[in-house]
């Protein structure tokens, strides 16, 4: 009996230590270089330090190099996150064959069963949408001409307590703004670890071209802090 109690205590202490190890993340790109980025397709960093996702008849993406923890599998705790970026989309076209810019949370492993969650700034269908695996969960119309060639501010937040993903877009030069939000349990959609970043795709048309620049980007994620008593109860329930 004594040895069993000691084993339980040892396991409890190991799990309690692990419970404190959920990974909060914070980074800030005031300007970009290729360090700490995974660039795919035509994605590049300009001489001005802008992240450029210009593409014709193809797809490109740029993700932060380190995976981001969304859920702690030991405690079931889910992270809240807050990301801000400045983007500039300039469209020159005679046909609707370009579709703007996406902010995306994607699986780390390509063959994962986890879904992809994206916020689309869609210049083809003139809408801002929250999508899961390209299925529209919630969308609002926007007039992309209000932002064309302008430095627009974007903020995307997820509150793990209220389960709300919220998006706001604003143009400081004109005062125009758009907002959309949706209730979502990201832990049911995403893997415990994801990559975060941007993607863009374009159709082909001789006279269609869209420049998409991200001028700056910050991201932070944080797990709610259980008290020692709450962590103890969670872990004891796991091992008893």
Swiss-Prot record:
One GO molecular function term? alpha-amylase inhibitor activity
Propeptide segment residues: 234-240
Q: Which cysteines are joined by disulfide bonds?
A: none
Where does the record locate the signal sequence feature?
1-21
Q: Which UniProt keywords apply?
A: Alpha-amylase inhibitor, Glycoprotein, Lectin, Signal
Q: Which CDD domains match?
A: lectin_legume_LecRK_Arcelin_ConA
State the function annotated in the UniProt record.
Lectin and alpha-amylase inhibitor. Acts as a defensive protein against insects.
Q: Which family does it belong to?
A: Belongs to the leguminous lectin family.
This protein's assembly is summarised as: Heterodimer of chain 1 and chain 2.
* Protein's name in the database: Alpha-amylase inhibitor 2
Q: Which organism is it from?
A: Phaseolus vulgaris (Kidney bean)
């Amino acid at each position: 009996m004594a040895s069993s109690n000691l084993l339980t205590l040892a396991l409890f202490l190991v799990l309690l230590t692990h419970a404190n190890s959920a990974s909060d993340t914070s980074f800030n790109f005031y300007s970009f270089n290729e360090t700490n980025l995974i660039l795919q397709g035509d994605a590049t960093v300009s001489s001005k330090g802008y992240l450029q996702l210009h593409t014709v008849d193809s797809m490109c993406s740029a993700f932060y190099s380190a995976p981001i923890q969304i859920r702690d599998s030991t405690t079931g705790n889910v992270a809240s996150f807050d990301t801000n970026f400045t983007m500039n989309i300039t469209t020159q076209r005679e046909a609707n064959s370009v579709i703007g810019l996406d902010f995306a949370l994607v699986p780390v492993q390509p063959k994962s069963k986890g879904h992809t969650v994206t916020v689309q700034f869609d210049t083809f269908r003139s809408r801002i949408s929250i999508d899961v695996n390209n299925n529209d969960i919630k969308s609002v119309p926007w007039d992309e001409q209000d932002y064309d060639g302008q430095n627009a501010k974007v903020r995307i937040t997820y509150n793990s307590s209220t389960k709300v993903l919220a998006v706001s877009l604003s143009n400081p030069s004109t005062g125009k703004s758009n907002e959309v939000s949706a209730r979502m349990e990201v832990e049911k959609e995403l893997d415990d670890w994801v990559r975060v970043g941007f993607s863009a795709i374009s159709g082909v048309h001789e006279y269609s071209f869209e420049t998409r620049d991200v001028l700056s980007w910050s991201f932070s994620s944080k797990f709610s802090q259980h008290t020692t008593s709450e962590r103890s109860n969670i872990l004891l329930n796991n091992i008893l």
